[in-house]
UniProtKB/Swiss-Prot annotation:
Enzyme Commission code: 2.7.11.5, 3.1.3.-
Lineage, broadest ranks: Bacteria, Pseudomonadati, Pseudomonadota, Gammaproteobacteria, Enterobacterales
UniProt name for this protein: Isocitrate dehydrogenase kinase/phosphatase
HAMAP family tied to this protein: AceK
Annotated binding of ATP, by residue: A315, P316, G317, I318, R319, G320, M321, K336
GO CC annotation: cytoplasm
Subcellular localization: Cytoplasm
Keyword Chloroplast listed: no
NCBIfam families xrefs: PRK02946.1
Gene from which this protein is expressed: aceK
């Protein structure tokens, strides 16, 4: 093939990425209108649509390339020259880092995830030195309290692009100042100033003002979630100023933000200062660039692997009936493989499990479901695999493994944030920590249900505890929509011996769920049962679940808060 064809292919891939990111920005730019019009169902649809855009445009480019090459075979040297031409197109390209990931995706689609080497792919960036480049235009604006904090905040809120009236702007400003004064003191506040991102961050039913509070002691987050009333008036719900609070807002268990970012790398660098605990992958994930986040996540994994001599081991916790889970002892992620054969009580297929994981990817995760990254043909060095894990892999997933001598290839796996399994956490804590964990677990169930998600298997082992103490669901094989479940009361026993029988005295159909039965396994531990009955007894009533179903069917979309109820201004300051 000619050298001109190699350049044409490189240009076609980059043009395809341009088209994809253009549509990405187009969908994102509609977030303001959806918020102003309270079109919450459109918010959910836009979230799904934006996720699908990437794979759709990869497919379009692949079809173009097949037409261009007209079915001719391509040797290794040809492919290397295509990558070389593509690399030459990137030095002046503003979104070079995501363009590299797009190239990887096109290659993987064309060659069915085979021969994934650094020579053929951008396993590592071709331009790592550009990460801290000069930003062409300011991402944020500085505001100084020369005339006090009230006029400063008035100016910030008045400059917002939102076209709705405020419910009571002066009240909200008073609340913000009260929070800042209480937290930092008047003297420190007088010597501080704000830097506020030019673009709002939209998610669910809120528009987030994201900024930095620059104090004499250092830089802190400054986050204002702006909501609208049913009457279409704006109000600030709270003010968050700690890195822990910001980390939860930008957490891995939440849906991606809609924020207009023509230069995503620049935005990621700007955010890094107020989210010091977040990796590059997590920051890209938070702003919706999930495919590039996958690239960065893989790079973080390779870096960890290169700087440790740890072996892969089975992950701590109760062994799953559907998934085989392993990890590196010091790494903050786990690797999950769908087993070849499931336990008898798991009547489902591998395709069903994959569909459940995709549902979670596209759905509003409300801070209660862990995001995952999906990989194919994942290579592991045998010397890094503990013998016990290797035996387990060969027993539980032989069809998923290709033996290459010194390496194995895992045909398909998921990577997910590592957490402490809730059942293990509950064994280790007591007192207030135990109470907090049970409260968190019940709240997780409620928030998932309100978002039209029924976990299916609600055992403690299927939930994890994050480093911030939040309880997050991570076992998705029985997940379904709330509206697909038939919540029933257990019929009254006909005779006393009915309750002693091994089989139920009533009929049970597929999709039937009896919430009264939850009590048997959620309250079995005498330390936990009384706490659960105190805080979450309504979860054992079928009418509670049916009432939620009614609200969902009527089109109601619940409010989701990335902070505790007591932090809301309406509870904290209202008389």
């Amino acid at each position: 093939m000619s050298r001109g064809l190699e350049l044409l292919i490189a240009q076609t891939i980059l043009q395809g990425f341009d088209a994809q990111y253009g549509r990405f920005l187009e969908v994102t730019s509609g977030a303001q209108q959806r918020f102003e019009q309270a079109d919450w169902h459109a918010v959910q649809q836009a979230m799904k649509s934006r996720i699908h855009l990437y794979d759709h445009h990869v497919g379009l480019v692949v079809e173009q390339l097949r037409c261009i090459t007209d079915g001719k075979s391509t040797d290794a040297a040809f492919l290397l020259r295509v990558k070389e031409h593509y690399t030459r197109l990137l030095p002046d390209y503003p979104r070079f880092e995501i363009a590299e990931s797009f190239f990887n995706s096109v290659y993987c689609r064309l060659f069915d995830h085979r021969s994934l080497t650094p020579e053929r792919l951008f396993i590592f960036s071709s331009q790592p030195e550009r990460r801290f480049r000069t930003i062409p235009r300011p991402l944020a604006k500085d505001f100084f309290p020369d005339h006090g904090w009230e006029p400063l905040l008035t100016r910030i809120l008045s400059d917002l692009p939102l076209r709705l009236p405020w419910q009571n702007k002066s009240r909200d400003i008073h609340y913000i100042i009260a929070h800042l004064t209480e937290t930092f003191g008047a003297e420190a506040l007088h010597r501080s100033h704000l830097q506020v991102a030019n673009e709002l961050f939209y998610r669910n039913k809120a528009a987030w003002l994201v900024g930095k509070l620059l104090t004499p002691a250092g830089t802190l987050p400054f986050l204002l979630p702006i909501h609208r009333t049913d009457e279409g008036e704006l109000f600030v719900d709270t003010c968050l100023t700690t890195t822990a609070e910001a980390s939860i807002v930008f957490g891995f268990a939440r849906s991606y933000f809609m924020v207009y970012a023509p230069l995503p790398a620049a935005l990621v660098e700007w955010l890094r200062e107020i989210l010091p605990g977040k990796t590059t992958a997590e920051l890209y994930m938070a702003i919706g660039c999930q495919k590039h986040a996958k690239t960065e996540s893989y790079r973080e994994y390779l870096l960890y692997l290169a700087n440790s001599d740890e072996q892969f081991i089975e992950a701590p916790g109760i062994r799953g009936m559907v998934m085989l889970v392993f990890t590196l002892p010091g790494f903050d992620r786990v690797f999950k493989i769908i087993k070849d054969r499931f336990a008898p009580q798991k009547e489902m297929s591998a395709a069903h499990v994959r569909a459940c994981y995709q549902l979670v990817k596209e759905h509003d995760r409300v801070g209660r479901m862990a995001d995952t990254q999906e990989f194919e043909n994942f290579v592991l060095e045998k010397r890094r695999i503990a013998p016990a894990l290797m035996t387990l892999l060969r027993q539980e997933a032989p069809e998923k493994i290709i033996d290459l001598g010194d390496q194995i290839v895992i045909r398909h796996l998921y990577i997910e944030r590592r957490m402490v399994p809730l059942n293990i956490w509950l064994e280790q804590v007591e007192g207030q920590q135990l109470r907090d964990a049970i409260e968190e677990y019940g709240n997780a169930i409620r928030q998932l249900a309100a978002a039209n998600i029924f976990p299916g298997d609600m055992l403690f082992k299927n939930f994890g505890v994050t480093r911030h103490g939040r309880v997050v669901f991570y076992d998705y094989d029985e997940i379904c929509y709330m509206t697909e479940v038939n919540f029933r009361d257990i019929p009254q026993a006909r005779y006393p011996e009915d309750e002693l029988a091994s089989e139920p005295w009533y009929s049970v159909s597929p999709g039937d769920v009896f919430p009264e039965e939850f009590r048997h396994w959620l309250c079995a531990d005498p330390r936990i049962g009384p706490l659960f009955e105190e805080m979450h007894a309504d979860l054992f009533r079928a009418d509670y679940w049916r009432a939620l179903q009614t609200r969902i069917r009527e089109g109601h979309v619940e409010d989701v808060y990335a902070y505790r109820r007591k932090q809301r201004f309406c509870f904290r300051f209202a008389a």
